Amino acid sequence: MRFMYIVTPAHPVPATTELMEAVHKLADREIKAGHMLDSGALMPRTLGAQVRITDGQLSVIDGPFVEAKEVIGGYAIFELRDKEEAVAKAVEFMQVHKDHMPGWEGTCEVRAFAGP
């Protein structure tokens, strides 16, 4: 099954070098094992754009936008056996944050892709 991890920090702060090194080490291991298919950090919302449909009309809006309460910081896509394995790997990923950037708070949402 394919899963997406959506990482949302409670407070947007730059990651420490120690955290980035630990995350890259974990990602390298998961890529070599054939589990991690893709991952990345996202640029700030102020650099993005939104395409909307309102009352049947398309519009494109460049950032910056009104601040959202939650801002997605990054994502990862995994191919794993089941939800239990996906959650276990997400727990390990979040433990890396706890160990290498004390005080960091956030969420890693685990979502299965629809379909095969």
Enumerate the language-model features and the residues they cover.
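Conserved, structured core segments of small domains
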Residues: 1-116
